Amino acid sequence: MPRKGYIAKREILPDPIYKNRVLTKFINQIMLDGKKGTAESICYNAFELIQEKTGKDPIEVFETALKNVMPVLEVKARRVGGANYQVPIEVRTDRRQTLGLRWLVGYARKRSEKTMEERIAGELMDAANNTGGSIKKKEDTHKMAEANKAFAHYRW
């Protein structure tokens, strides 16, 4: 807890093409070594691939995928009397979104397609259809929370 109050969050500007703030966060998550232009081109090319393959609006596919990936519960380690317990807690809205974006990009990087555009397009389409690595991660997180439900009274 900071002694001098909380720092105001920086305002994130919407992306230049779709005018969407969440998409800007997604682009920032894709970005490596500060190369934002490269990250933007990867994202927009992936969106073009989604448009070609599904015929749907890529922003709708992206929002559906993100909604499907965002976790509701997670576990946090809590030390009680010399033992560590995995305590299930609800995830705040902003953290829910951040985790969803992080998992989408992380599991897209692990995919076997040749280019990053194809990987991101594939992961977004899979997540929109409730399949893929990022959805499995969400389900595993929920299973962990469900398994440790007995320790919910240790919540702080």
Curated annotation (Swiss-Prot):
<keyword id="KW-0699">rRNA-binding</keyword>
<comment type="similarity">
    <text>Belongs to the universal ribosomal protein uS7 family.</text>
</comment>
<dbReference type="InterPro" id="IPR020606">
    <property type="entry name" value="Ribosomal_uS7_CS"/>
</dbReference>
<dbReference type="GO" id="GO:0015935">
    <property type="term" value="C:small ribosomal subunit"/>
</dbReference>
<keyword id="KW-0820">tRNA-binding</keyword>
<comment type="function">
    <text>One of the primary rRNA binding proteins, it binds directly to 16S rRNA where it nucleates assembly of the head domain of the 30S subunit. Is located at the subunit interface close to the decoding center, probably blocks exit of the E-site tRNA.</text>
</comment>
<keyword id="KW-0689">Ribosomal protein</keyword>
<dbReference type="InterPro" id="IPR036823">
    <property type="entry name" value="Ribosomal_uS7_dom_sf"/>
</dbReference>
<keyword id="KW-0687">Ribonucleoprotein</keyword>
<dbReference type="GO" id="GO:0003735">
    <property type="term" value="F:structural constituent of ribosome"/>
</dbReference>
<keyword id="KW-0694">RNA-binding</keyword>
<dbReference type="InterPro" id="IPR023798">
    <property type="entry name" value="Ribosomal_uS7_dom"/>
</dbReference>
<dbReference type="GO" id="GO:0019843">
    <property type="term" value="F:rRNA binding"/>
</dbReference>
<dbReference type="GO" id="GO:0000049">
    <property type="term" value="F:tRNA binding"/>
</dbReference>
<dbReference type="InterPro" id="IPR000235">
    <property type="entry name" value="Ribosomal_uS7"/>
</dbReference>
<dbReference type="GO" id="GO:0006412">
    <property type="term" value="P:translation"/>
</dbReference>
<dbReference type="Pfam" id="PF00177">
    <property type="entry name" value="Ribosomal_S7"/>
</dbReference>
<protein>
    <recommendedName>
        <fullName>Small ribosomal subunit protein uS7</fullName>
    </recommendedName>
</protein>
<dbReference type="InterPro" id="IPR005717">
    <property type="entry name" value="Ribosomal_uS7_bac/org-type"/>
</dbReference>
<comment type="subunit">
    <text>Part of the 30S ribosomal subunit. Contacts proteins S9 and S11.</text>
</comment>
